Protein backbone atom coordinates (compact mmCIF):
# COMPACT_ATOMS: atom_id res chain seq x y z
CA UNK A 1 0.00 0.00 0.00
CA UNK A 2 2.91 2.37 0.77
CA UNK A 3 4.22 1.92 -2.76
CA UNK A 4 0.91 3.17 -4.23
CA UNK A 5 0.81 6.21 -1.93
CA UNK A 6 4.40 7.15 -2.79
CA UNK A 7 3.80 6.67 -6.51
CA UNK A 8 0.60 8.71 -6.36
CA UNK A 9 2.40 11.50 -4.47
CA UNK A 10 5.17 11.59 -7.08
CA UNK A 11 2.65 11.67 -9.94
CA UNK A 12 0.74 14.55 -8.31
CA UNK A 13 3.96 16.48 -7.67
CA UNK A 14 5.10 15.93 -11.28
CA UNK A 15 1.72 17.09 -12.61
CA UNK A 16 1.90 20.21 -10.42
CA UNK A 17 5.41 21.06 -11.68
CA UNK A 18 4.34 20.43 -15.30
CA UNK A 19 1.36 22.76 -14.81
CA UNK A 20 3.55 25.49 -13.32
CA UNK A 21 5.99 25.23 -16.24
CA UNK A 22 3.32 24.93 -18.96
CA UNK A 23 0.97 27.64 -17.68
CA UNK A 24 3.00 30.71 -18.76
CA UNK A 25 3.69 29.10 -22.13
CA UNK A 26 -0.01 28.35 -22.68
CA UNK A 27 -1.08 31.83 -21.55
CA UNK A 28 1.37 33.44 -23.96
CA UNK A 29 0.19 31.23 -26.83
CA UNK A 30 -3.48 31.92 -26.10
CA UNK A 31 -2.93 35.66 -25.78
CA UNK A 32 -1.13 35.72 -29.14
CA UNK A 33 -3.86 33.66 -30.82
CA UNK A 34 -6.56 36.00 -29.51
CA UNK A 35 -4.65 39.11 -30.55
CA UNK A 36 -4.32 37.77 -34.09
CA UNK A 37 -8.05 37.05 -34.42
CA UNK A 38 -9.24 40.43 -33.15
CA UNK A 39 -6.57 43.12 -33.34
CA UNK A 40 -7.38 46.50 -31.88
CA UNK A 41 -5.83 49.77 -32.95
CA UNK A 42 -5.23 52.67 -30.57
CA UNK A 43 -8.05 55.21 -30.90
CA UNK A 44 -9.68 58.16 -29.17
CA UNK A 45 -13.32 58.80 -30.06
CA UNK A 46 -15.22 61.93 -29.02
CA UNK A 47 -18.59 60.41 -28.13
CA UNK A 48 -20.01 63.72 -26.94
CA UNK A 49 -19.52 65.18 -30.43
CA UNK A 50 -21.64 62.43 -32.03
CA UNK A 51 -25.24 63.53 -32.48
CA UNK A 52 -28.31 61.38 -33.23
CA UNK A 53 -28.37 62.52 -36.89
CA UNK A 54 -24.66 61.64 -37.30
CA UNK A 55 -25.25 57.98 -36.43
CA UNK A 56 -26.30 55.44 -39.07
CA UNK A 57 -29.94 54.39 -39.04
CA UNK A 58 -30.91 50.88 -38.01
CA UNK A 59 -33.85 48.66 -38.91
CA UNK A 60 -35.74 50.51 -36.16
CA UNK A 61 -36.84 53.97 -37.32
CA UNK A 62 -36.43 55.41 -33.80
CA UNK A 63 -32.90 54.07 -33.17
CA UNK A 64 -29.60 55.15 -34.69
CA UNK A 65 -26.42 53.29 -33.77
CA UNK A 66 -22.78 52.88 -34.71
CA UNK A 67 -20.32 50.13 -33.82
CA UNK A 68 -17.08 51.50 -32.39
CA UNK A 69 -15.08 48.45 -31.28
CA UNK A 70 -15.62 44.88 -32.45
CA UNK A 71 -13.77 41.82 -31.16
CA UNK A 72 -14.57 38.11 -31.11
CA UNK A 73 -15.72 38.48 -27.48
CA UNK A 74 -17.62 41.78 -27.32
CA UNK A 75 -18.74 44.89 -29.15
CA UNK A 76 -18.91 48.50 -28.03
CA UNK A 77 -21.18 50.92 -29.82
CA UNK A 78 -23.01 54.17 -29.40
CA UNK A 79 -26.76 54.35 -29.77
CA UNK A 80 -29.29 57.14 -29.76
CA UNK A 81 -33.06 56.89 -29.76
CA UNK A 82 -35.54 54.31 -28.57
CA UNK A 83 -36.48 50.72 -29.23
CA UNK A 84 -39.56 48.80 -28.11
CA UNK A 85 -39.31 46.42 -25.15
CA UNK A 86 -37.23 43.38 -26.11
CA UNK A 87 -34.59 40.95 -24.87
CA UNK A 88 -31.45 39.27 -26.17
CA UNK A 89 -31.49 35.53 -25.33
CA UNK A 90 -27.76 35.06 -26.03
CA UNK A 91 -26.20 38.45 -25.28
CA UNK A 92 -25.48 40.37 -22.07
CA UNK A 93 -25.69 44.14 -22.53
CA UNK A 94 -24.25 47.02 -20.53
CA UNK A 95 -25.35 50.58 -21.27
CA UNK A 96 -23.86 53.81 -19.98
CA UNK A 97 -26.08 56.87 -20.42
CA UNK A 98 -24.18 59.85 -21.86
CA UNK A 99 -27.10 62.21 -22.57
CA UNK A 100 -30.82 62.36 -21.97
CA UNK A 101 -33.03 61.12 -19.18
CA UNK A 102 -36.24 59.21 -18.76
CA UNK A 103 -37.54 55.81 -17.76
CA UNK A 104 -37.19 52.41 -19.39
CA UNK A 105 -38.23 48.83 -18.80
CA UNK A 106 -35.60 46.75 -17.05
CA UNK A 107 -36.82 43.31 -16.11
CA UNK A 108 -40.42 43.72 -15.02
CA UNK A 109 -40.07 47.31 -13.77
CA UNK A 110 -39.85 50.84 -15.11
CA UNK A 111 -36.55 52.37 -13.97
CA UNK A 112 -35.46 56.01 -14.18
CA UNK A 113 -32.12 56.91 -15.75
CA UNK A 114 -30.06 60.04 -16.35
CA UNK A 115 -26.56 60.86 -17.63
CA UNK A 116 -24.03 58.82 -15.70
CA UNK A 117 -26.37 55.84 -15.15
CA UNK A 118 -24.86 52.39 -15.78
CA UNK A 119 -27.47 49.82 -16.81
CA UNK A 120 -26.62 46.11 -16.59
CA UNK A 121 -28.88 43.88 -18.69
CA UNK A 122 -28.23 40.13 -18.36
CA UNK A 123 -29.16 38.01 -21.37
CA UNK A 124 -32.87 37.23 -21.49
CA UNK A 125 -33.83 40.36 -19.50
CA UNK A 126 -36.60 42.54 -20.95
CA UNK A 127 -35.50 46.13 -21.56
CA UNK A 128 -36.32 49.15 -23.74
CA UNK A 129 -39.57 50.99 -24.29
CA UNK A 130 -38.01 54.24 -23.12
CA UNK A 131 -40.10 57.24 -22.10
CA UNK A 132 -37.84 60.23 -22.70
CA UNK A 133 -38.15 63.19 -20.32
CA UNK A 134 -35.05 64.99 -21.63
CA UNK A 135 -33.38 63.96 -24.80
CA UNK A 136 -32.42 62.64 -27.12
CA UNK A 137 -31.02 59.72 -25.16
CA UNK A 138 -27.47 58.70 -26.12
CA UNK A 139 -25.73 55.68 -24.59
CA UNK A 140 -22.65 53.53 -24.93
CA UNK A 141 -23.76 49.92 -25.46
CA UNK A 142 -21.45 46.99 -24.71
CA UNK A 143 -22.63 43.57 -25.88
CA UNK A 144 -21.05 40.36 -24.62
CA UNK A 145 -20.69 38.26 -26.74
CA UNK A 146 -21.33 40.27 -29.92
CA UNK A 147 -25.05 40.32 -30.64
CA UNK A 148 -26.11 38.16 -33.57
CA UNK A 149 -28.62 39.37 -36.17
CA UNK A 150 -31.38 37.14 -34.77
CA UNK A 151 -30.72 37.82 -31.06
CA UNK A 152 -33.49 40.38 -30.51
CA UNK A 153 -36.90 39.17 -29.37
CA UNK A 154 -39.57 41.90 -29.19
CA UNK A 155 -42.11 41.69 -26.36
CA UNK A 156 -45.55 43.13 -25.59
Q: Model regions: which residues?
A:
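A short, N-terminal "cap"/entry segment at the start of jelly-roll beta-barrel domains
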Residues: 3-7, 19, 23-78, 84-85, ...
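Hydrophobic membrane-insertion alpha-helices, especially the h-region
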Residues: 11-19
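Short strand-coil-strand connectors
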Residues: 72, 105-109
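Short, conserved beta-strand element in jelly-roll/cupin
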Residues: 78-79, 89-106
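Short histidine-centered beta-strand/loop micro-motifs
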Residues: 84-89, 130-131
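Short, surface-exposed coil-to-beta transition loops
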Residues: 90-92, 115, 125-127
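Short acidic-glycine-tyrosine-enriched beta hairpin
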Residues: 109-124
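Ligand-binding loop in jelly-roll beta-barrel domains
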Residues: 123-150
Amino acid sequence: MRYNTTTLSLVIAAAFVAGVVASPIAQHALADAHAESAPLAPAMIDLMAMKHADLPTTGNREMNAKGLVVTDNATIGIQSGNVAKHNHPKTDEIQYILEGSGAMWLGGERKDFKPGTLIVIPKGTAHGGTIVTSGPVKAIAIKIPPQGPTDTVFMN
